[in-house]
Amino acid sequence: MELGWLLVIGSYLLGSVSFSYIIAKKIKKVDIRQHGSGNAGATNTLRVLGVGPAVTVLLLDILKGVIAVVVTVQLTPDGDGWFAAAAGIAAIIGHNWPIYYGFRGGKGVATTIGVLASLVPLAAVLAGVIAIGSIVWTRYVSLGSLLFVTLTALLVAVLSQWFGYPVAYIYLTIIVAILSMWRHRSNIQRLLSGTENKLGRKKETT
């Protein structure tokens, strides 16, 4: 098997490591997926465990995305970005549907941040500033997450003629945006109905 595909598989396995699950088990002996929103990610960790564990989960989940694509870029220099893009998508899929935890994971936002910040940093930073601003203003993390992936995809498409982004990265951002929208479909419904949970408000049931 070609090295690039081995790296893609490895990225999925890396992405499947659920730090929110591990930390919740260690600190409170609970399954994070049975508490709060039921999501295995940093935002739900904040609701259930507090700021410290949530920041730890956020950074570790971002690191999964960074490691997956940076290692792949370094080891497949002639791949025209396709293996790096595939590795990034694989890491996000691993986070969302982890093989180690019955394919019940998170929504992949932090891992997505790691992937996009590593491969298309300017677009990710610009989109990130707007996304963070929207979270601060509305306190809707889901809205900020959706803005981040959507704006990154648009910016990569627009900026590619000046920055020479590989075509693979354009497809990557589109696929990542679609994945994120799918994972946030219930959040989108709640945003539209005005019932979405806001940052800082605890939610005790799934």
Curated annotation (Swiss-Prot):
Name the record gives this protein: Glycerol-3-phosphate acyltransferase
InterPro entries: G3P_acylTferase_PlsY
Listed GO biological process terms: phospholipid biosynthetic process
Source organism of this protein record: Halalkalibacterium halodurans (strain ATCC BAA-125 / DSM 18197 / FERM 7344 / JCM 9153 / C-125)
PANTHER family attached to this UniProt entry: GLYCEROL-3-PHOSPHATE ACYLTRANSFERASE-RELATED, INNER MEMBRANE PROTEIN YGIH
Transmembrane segments: 3-23, 51-71, 83-103, 113-133, 162-182
Subunit-level organization: Probably interacts with PlsX.
Reactions catalysed: an acyl phosphate + sn-glycerol 3-phosphate = a 1-acyl-sn-glycero-3-phosphate + phosphate
EC top class, as a word: transferase
Pathway: Lipid metabolism; phospholipid metabolism
Keywords carried by this UniProt record: Cell membrane, Lipid biosynthesis, Lipid metabolism, Membrane, Phospholipid biosynthesis, Phospholipid metabolism, Transferase, Transmembrane, Transmembrane helix
Pfam family, one: G3P_acyltransf
Role noted for this protein: Catalyzes the transfer of an acyl group from acyl-phosphate (acyl-PO(4)) to glycerol-3-phosphate (G3P) to form lysophosphatidic acid (LPA). This enzyme utilizes acyl-phosphate as fatty acyl donor, but not acyl-CoA or acyl-ACP.
Similarity comment text for this entry: Belongs to the PlsY family.
Subcellular location: Cell membrane
Cellular component, GO, one term: plasma membrane
Protein's membrane topology: Multi-pass membrane protein
EC number, as in UniProt: 2.3.1.275
